[in-house]
């Protein structure tokens, strides 16, 4: 009694085999069964009997009362209608086949099988979703159009996000031990940086560093140094991690990778140059070569694409994750990302909502912080002090809700002072931590050297002094 649908997979046998093998693991309570129950739901299985078996097994597992073998079969049959003899007979035949195989899948195979079943489920749900959209478009009434679009967006986002779910359970004593260790550090007067340091002491005191699973948004108007600040964060993180096992990923949708490296090199050498000025190159040649030798082997991977979709970003992170620990992902910048290859009539606000929600989901899925730059709207320039607020996030969608932190780069509007700063290439800026889900809000004063793309803390020692 398989579930009937109007379509067929190109590779039915692989999906059927994957579901059957997972049922063997469930029926025999195999090692690695936690992954199956954490990643899959009954809806993910194609065959109705498998849905019934899985639902019953998961319910008992969650009650800390796992049942296996014939006991599981009897529990499933007990839940069925007394007159449903055909389903009961089919379950008995199915269970006999499952239990005949003595060797259940190991943990490595289970991981692969779960992936096959989950992807097939997403594909199936997308096809059903598309069919529903097609059928309903002929019933649309003009006065319900906006509500219809919102419902379509919500349903589609749920399906996409279900592909990225990665749920793990932690025992309470494990969480308690971690928290106690942090409390003891504070008691001893030690600086608590539970994530990667930003490179700025005062900012770290507010944020405790960039922590796995967090989405951090850096927002400003054009020309305020967003990319430069991202490069500063990238450089700082790359110096802290193990180059043999860890990596920082930088997705640049605006600049080419050579431009990113050039800015990093100027930041590291604290000198500026252009390839068209030979005299300048001659003057700073030694500094540039020394700085390049220090940073050329840092564990950084650059991706420079003028157009990237969410799936392409996820694919790249997944690929790198096979060989390295992805410790930080940086995206420059959020509004240049495409949610899909074709936006299917989504408004830009709806698309940005999908982007920010998905980036947050990626941060949790890959257990890494993601820092994304974002543009502020022109509204900010209409206010007297031009101090940014959360609603200034351009085409914001739900950025302010999805982000764990929102940092604004703010410069004064004092024309005389700004002219002096232009002449010296040294600007006084405030980093305004306007949202901090897990800590206090606050401000950090920095100097920005535009000629070398460097942000320098005004009131604290250099990064090397702080964290060496």
Swiss-Prot record:
Signal peptide: none
UniProt similarity note: Belongs to the helicase family. DnaB subfamily.
Phenotype reported upon loss of the gene: Probably essential, it was not disrupted in a global transposon mutagenesis study.
Residues noted as binding ATP in the record, renumbered to the chain: 220-227
Gene Ontology, cellular component aspect: cytosol; primosome complex
Gene Ontology BP terms: DNA replication; DNA replication, synthesis of primer
Catalytic activity, EC: 5.6.2.3
Task performed by this protein: The main replicative DNA helicase, it participates in initiation and elongation during chromosome replication. Travels ahead of the DNA replisome, separating dsDNA into templates for DNA synthesis. A processive ATP-dependent 5'-3' DNA helicase it has DNA-dependent ATPase activity.
UniProt catalytic activity: Couples ATP hydrolysis with the unwinding of duplex DNA at the replication fork by translocating in the 5'-3' direction. This creates two antiparallel DNA single strands (ssDNA). The leading ssDNA polymer is the template for DNA polymerase III holoenzyme which synthesizes a continuous strand; ATP + H2O = ADP + phosphate + H(+)
Gene that produces this protein: dnaB
Subunit composition and interactions: Homohexamer.
UniProt keyword Translocase present: no
Listed InterPro entries: AAA+_ATPase, DNA_helicase_DnaB-like_C, DNA_helicase_N/primase_C, P-loop_NTPase
Protein name: Replicative DNA helicase DnaB
UniProt cross-references to Gene3D superfamilies, sorted A to Z: DNAb Helicase, Chain A, P-loop containing nucleotide triphosphate hydrolases
Example of a GO MF term: DNA helicase activity
Membrane-crossing segments per the record: none
Domain SF4 helicase intervals: 189-462
EC main group: isomerase
Keywords: ATP-binding, DNA replication, DNA-binding, Helicase, Hydrolase, Isomerase, Nucleotide-binding, Primosome
